Amino acid sequence: MAACRAQPPTSEQAWLEAAQTFIQETLCPAGKEVDKELTRSVIACVKETWLSQGENQDLTLPFSYSFVSVQSLKTHQRLPCCSHLSWSQSAYQAWTRGGRPGDGVLPREQLILLGTLVDLLGDSEQECRSGSLYVRDNTGTLDCELIDLDLSWLGHLFLFPSWSYLPSAKRNSLGEGHLELWGTPVPVFPLTVSPGPLIPIPVLYPEKASHLLRYRKKSSIKEINLAGKLVHLSALIITQNKRYFIMTLGELAQAGSQVSIIVQIPAQMVWHRVLRPGRAYVLTKLQVTKTRIHLSCIWTTIPSSTLKPLRPGYVQELELDLEFSKADLKPPPQPTSSKDSRGQEGLVRASKVLHYLGTVTAVLHESAGLYILDGQLILCLAYQKIHGLRRVIRPGVCLELRDVHLLQAVGGATTKPVLALCLHGTVRLQGFSCLKPLTLPSSKVYGASLYEQLVWKCQLGLPLYLWAAKTLEDLIYKLCPHVLRCHQFLKQPSPGKPSLGLQLLAPSWDVLIPPGSPMRHAYSEILEEPHNCPLQKYTPLQTPYSFPTMLALAEEGQHRAWATFDPKAMLPLPEASHLTSCQLNRHLAWSWVCLPSCVFQPAQVLLGVLVASSRKGCLELRDLRGSLPCIPLTESSQPLIDPNLVGCLVRVEKFQLVVEREVRSSFPSWEEMGMARFIQKKQARVYVQFYLADALILPVPRPTFGSEPSQTASSCPEGPHLGQSRLFLLSHKEALMKRNFCLLPGDSSQPAKPTLSFHVSGTWLCGTQRKEGSGWSPPESLAVESKDQKVFLIFLGSSVRWFPFLYPNQVYRLVASGPSQTPVFETEGSAGTSRRPLELADCGSCLTVQEEWTLELGSSQDIPNVLEVPRTLPESSLAQLLGDNSPDSLVSFSAEILSRILCEPPLALRRMKPGNAGAIKTGVKLTVALEMDDCEYPPHLDIYIEDPQLPPQIGLLPGARVHFSQLEKRISRSNIVYCCFRSSTSVQVLSFPPETKASAPLPHIYLAELLQGDRPPFQATTSCHIVYVLSLQILWVCAHCTSICPQGKCSRRDPSCPSQRAVSQANIRLLVEDGTAEATVICRNHLVARALGLSPSEWSSILEHARGPGRVALQFTGLGGQTESASKTHEPLTLLLRTLCTSPFVLRPVKLSFALERRPTDISPREPSRLQQFQCGELPLLTRVNPRLRLVCLSLQEPELPNPPQASAASS
């Protein structure tokens, strides 16, 4: 505070001279001579106040104190302080003990403050008075707060013995501090006491004034004086045009004896600080006026009206020359509330109205008007426009609340009861705080106008308002300050420019706000009986939704994914019990969980800034706590191709949170699947998928994250002021992967290592264009018009961020900023030319995209004489895919992913040195169903992703539709067509997996239909008859090495086989026919029991008997033929199985669901028909017979028996 005042003088004479100088400069009217009487009065007042301590009798003047002006406080005092001239040191210490331990108490400064107490900010009487109080001297005016005010104090010079000064809590705001005036100010000159009236004032009391108002037409009285006890005082109403308040005189117990007066004269707004409910007053010169809303009449003051305390002998009741009947004297009937509960009587609760006196213990949110009282109650002042008082409220302040609403269990993450004031109630300051103001974050200081709009324009009820305030605070925690500044997020809305905070909350308010909610009317809220306001009734709120951070959402997704990870549930027992250890662990190695947004309670809303990552080459939604990869799609199955959306704020309510789980396990067999110790490692990859139609995209008014500054340049609507650009049509994009690049000259010191990069090939559509204002100049003429304009672009380093936006058959604009005079896009034979000679053989130029270059979505319409670019995706024909004429060609197609499993890496990688084993990645096998317009039953195809340099691909999930471009087609040694990812491959997700997918039933066909047409169904159902059994085999094999296990012990006898487990495996081959054709069907494992007609317990018993020999095999030569058995034929189990296989229990009609053993991708030559002789009586018949179909059993059921005919009624 040293800067606020000079050092106090050391002698009495010097102190008096400094005081005289201060009084002359600060308190004397400008332009007048020295007022010695004023100087003597001020010093005498200071001396009297100083000596009132009782501890300073040895010093008659406060030499340690110095005078301070208003301007000095506003200019130099940057920290809160207090001064107590009349307090002793012990009194100050006792006062400071009122603060809680750890809280900062206001430091004491030795300052003397004098000034005139006024209710007018300026010097002109024409200025509007708002009811605020000020301390004024010659240097300026300062806002102040006073607990008790007497109207006679206004305009007089006072010494303020105890006060505190608090600068503004907002940064960079000078002169917005305020004074808190403790105790009663001491007048420098004695105040003149106004004598009572010479004759008593004729007055009406409330009961007769109320009757007169109702029957005013019967009386000629136009102006009255009113006396009575103040029973109710409304809040000070602040509108755009004026301020006013309403006071009610009368008796609380008698509703008909009350009368209301509206005070709306600006000079009388200060009355609101003086009036105290329970005291009696006299108001003079009242007239009748009509309210704007209800057009009802009410008494009102005029500029010459006065307010006086009611004292005995000052008034005399006025006798009216009116005669009232008994019916007239009855109070008017009270209207009943017409508020409709809309059928929710069981949910709607009523608040309680009460008076409360409490101490503020915490500030929840200053801008939202939320505080904590006595550590137990939430105080909400948002439903009153209280501006001046809010700056005073801090821990330690004592408040009196009258006619306040008590709401309990409001919900919306609020557990404490809430006290809320409507316009009918008042809040009055009862005591200041000795504590310094808390240093609040910007989120709780800015945005008062936004929170007012939530109440007054959006008409939010209290439960919803509390939730909205908490949600806005969470959003600031997510986005500020690196995404945008707090004051930008909470800025006051303007026409055409809604607040960003409101835009994020508003999309769901149509559901949350009840339809037909009435608008607030101040007159109705204050005057209507019974009382009706937004706080009168409320419905407890279930938290509608929340905005989790990206980190919290990813952690929640992983938690749910691993909580549902159950190996036994993933592999049901009938299937798992027959798998070897290798098969078992491979099935568990990869799985995924899709969590739609509807499964979260409360609902989760995705909110983040769209960022293109240069480290991963994918799109991310990012906030201050983390980021999540994302895949946005349009409704037309098109990806996001506009780079201008980078840096925008994305809000999504409907999305899919995908968690891919990878597990490294070593379960010996299915029996140990419940033991967690066999899981060595597990990891998850989390990302989100959503459609742009379900997203709200908002531009952010400033750059987003400083870690990747270059990517926000394209999102700037103005664009660079200087630069050049060129349009190109993209024809193909290669895979994003780590590639080797030659070192540039001078970089030999850096070791070469693979770099994440990708390449695109395309065609220049025109020459270079220069920046002209906000657009581009016409394209420059080409040096050689006939030259091929094909181009090869290399993206590496920071330019990898453009990978998610580049897709074939799209037009893009490559922009290079800066005043470069050299056309950078015409450069040929760049450093990348020698790196990829094969790819560049057909390209006229090669460019490495620089990190500072940006990408924009272009259009071929920008260039004249250029045909519209087709948007269809390249598709290979079915003949190209499944033909054997081009075994190593590149193919493109769209398909639906049916399954995805992890597979072993290629043999070349498995032969790597043990030291590099950590770098080996397992491959991925996708089984897809091709989408072909001319194919009724889409064939299935396997796709392998085995390149270790390829980063993990997101979005390749079962059920998703994907377009694969330039896969390498291969043919296996068994003539099966499959495809592999290569560096030239690119992937485009067309649609996400459906949240609920109903499996379509298999078609029911005749077997002969499988022999007709080129593309029969791969899977189907048929009704057939088992003719005979061809073979049956039951094995017990080692779960680790698959060797035969007689007596349950591995026959390999190799120390390298650690397994002590054996699993059973069985298969049976059947001959079936349905009258149109015959087929051999193989059934495996648990389906063997169904084929043999055995119950689970009977099948388990047979398996246990087969455990001893380890292998039981039966081979049947034909119908009626002998059995060829690898087992001993005299053994009981063999005899049982041989008898069973030839019995009618097996040879029966069944309903068979099957898959073709010959896959649609099998291009091996089909087996030709053969000649076969049949005996028909005595005549031999020779005919050509088609080869038997080979089927794999999927399920086997007993045929449905026809319903028996209804028995006819017996004749009488």
Swiss-Prot record:
Main location: nucleus
Keyword DNA-binding assigned: yes
Compartments where found: Nucleus; Chromosome, Telomere
GO biological process terms held by the UniProt record: bone marrow development; chromosome organization; DNA damage response; hematopoietic stem cell proliferation; multicellular organism growth; negative regulation of telomere maintenance via telomerase; positive regulation of DNA replication; positive regulation of fibroblast proliferation
A GO-annotated cellular component: CST complex
InterPro entries the record matches: CTC1, CTC1-like
Signal peptide segment: none
Gene Ontology molecular function terms on file: G-rich strand telomeric DNA binding; single-stranded DNA binding
Keyword Nucleus: yes
Keyword annotations of the record: Chromosome, DNA-binding, Nucleus, Telomere
Known role: Component of the CST complex proposed to act as a specialized replication factor promoting DNA replication under conditions of replication stress or natural replication barriers such as the telomere duplex. The CST complex binds single-stranded DNA with high affinity in a sequence-independent manner, while isolated subunits bind DNA with low affinity by themselves. Initially the CST complex has been proposed to protect telomeres from DNA degradation. However, the CST complex has been shown to be involved in several aspects of telomere replication.
The protein's assembly and partners: Component of the CST complex, composed of TEN1/C17orf106, CTC1/C17orf68 and STN1; in the complex interacts directly with STN1. Interacts with ACD and POT1.
Protein's UniProt name: CST complex subunit CTC1
Organism from which the protein derives: Mus musculus
Organism lineage: Eukaryota, Metazoa, Chordata, Craniata, Vertebrata
